[in-house]
A protein has these predicted regions:
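Flexible internal linker/loop segments at domain or repeat junctions
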Residues: 270-298
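Residue-level signature of the transmembrane alpha-helical core
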Residues: 53, 81-82, 113, 117, ...
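Transmembrane alpha-helical segments that form the membrane-embedded catalytic/substrate-channel core
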Residues: 85-95, 124-128, 252-281
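Long helical/loop segments within the catalytic core of UDP-sugar-dependent glycosyltransferases
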Residues: 86, 126, 297-307
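Histidine-centered catalytic micro-motifs
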Residues: 91-100, 128-140, 267-275, 305-319
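Non-catalytic, topology-defining segments of multipass membrane proteins
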Residues: 1-83, 118-249, 322-389
Length: 389
């Protein structure tokens, strides 16, 4: 397929100003040497993936069910609900690993199993995260072509607050996307284009437009959409017949919203977001990203499946999550204390969020906030993307 044509706007913000110590560390940092020190850690072990995911899934289902007999307004019911949120969040986080290893044929069973067991019932099928590759592309990271990035440190603080508030509406997204727009899109090509451009990517940049499915992907995407629609129909039938109470549906909505808010908080802490919507090198991406190596048991709750060591992930996106801690320990041992990699560390979630708030306020005080984006120019769409039927 021909590459999507992109019309890059003229720069609208000054170049990124890194602190002097960061600049020196970036100049001295060698990605190749860091990679060589991690030899032998790049092979994913599927047994670990299956065991972790299935255990998390069992905990999620059991704790979700327990809320009913315990009572949602009791201490026990509230505790069970919190456990279900954390377990579901961990299950959901595996979509990130799936996005990185989807090219490996050995990963297909896990990808399909995760999708059937968790992705489709949660109305988050795997194709909705195919856009993640752009977040690691040197040309796209931090630009308007990156669905998962906004230069929040250079934007109004309200932009960050919105990312914590809007997820409360996400329980409505799945039913709307798969229950309303999807059936219409099967018969109206224009709606189908709108569906894939605007409603088929997990994103924080609401102006981001996703790609259309490739010819070889169309059937697979539609089958996943149909499965989500059938699942919704089955749930509706169970509720209508009284087999499942309406209260469980509201519980699912509360669960989904809580997971979405928790993930948004994690996202706000995952990067420094100091980009100016221009391309960044791999080292610059690493410096714009944050590691949270301290308080591992707590960090694993709000940044599960390796997401707490996010700077490591952007430096070495081919690492499987179960080797992150060993890889981090090797790098810390091999690199000097003033290494660029060591400068990506943050004490914790609150510290990272606090830094983002301070940087946004500093830009506001200095009058250097990014202006609101102008309307995006129309993108040329390759012929094979126009043929979406």
């Amino acid at each position: 397929m021909a590459e999507r044509q992109r019309q890059r706007p003229e720069p609208t913000a000054p170049a990124i100003v890194w602190e002097p110590e960061v600049q020196r560390a970036m100049r001295d940092f060698s990605v190749r040497e860091a990679h060589q020190s991690l030899n032998g850690l790049f092979k994913p072990r599927l047994a670990v993936y299956w065991a972790d995911f299935l255990c998390s899934y069992v905990v999620a289902v059991a704790s979700f069910w327990a809320v009913g007999p315990l009572g949602g307004l009791t201490a026990g019911g509230a505790a069970a609900f919190v456990v279900s949120v954390l377990a579901v969040f961990r299950c959901f986080a595996f979509i990130h690993e799936i996005a990185h290893f989807r090219a490996k044929r050995s990963f297909n069973r896990f990808r399909n199993g995760w999708n059937i067991i968790f992705g489709i019932p949660m109305l988050v099928p795997v194709f909705m995260y195919d856009c993640h590759g752009e977040h690691h592309n040197r040309r796209f990271y931090g630009t308007g072509e990156d669905a998962e990035y906004l230069p929040l440190a250079r934007m109004s603080l309200w932009s960050s607050v919105q990312l914590l508030v809007l997820p409360l509406m996400l329980p409505l997204f799945g039913p709307y996307r798969f229950g309303v727009v999807t059936p219409v899109s099967w018969f109206v090509p224009r709606v189908r284009t709108y569906l894939y451009r605007n409603l088929s990517s997990l994103k924080i940049d609401l102006e981001y437009e996703g790609r259309l499915p490739k010819p070889e992907e169309k059937l697979n995407w539609r089958l996943q959409e149909a499965a989500c629609l059938l699942w919704m129909g089955a749930v509706a039938a169970l509720v209508a017949t009284g087999t499942v109470s309406l209260g469980r549906v509201w519980q699912w909505c509360a669960l989904f919203a809580a997971v979405a808010v928790l993930n948004s908080a994690r996202l706000l802490a995952a990067h420094r977001y100091v980009g100016n919507e221009e391309e960044m090198s791999v080292v610059e991406q690493m410096m714009d990203t944050v590691n949270h190596p301290r308080n591992r048991p707590l960090a694993e709750l709000w940044a599960p499946v390796g997401l707490r060591l996010h700077a490591l992930h952007h430096l070495m996106p081919g690492l499987p999550y179960h080797n992150y801690q060993l890889a981090h320990d090797r790098l810390v041992s091999a690199l000097p204390p003033d290494s660029a990699y060591r400068l990506t560390e943050s004490p914790g979630l609150c510290a990272s969020l606090g830094r983002l708030v301070r940087e946004s306020r500093a830009h506001q005080k200095a009058g250097t906030l990014l202006p609101a984006r102008a309307a995006k120019p129309a993108r040329a769409v390759p012929s094979d993307e126009r043929a979406v039927r």
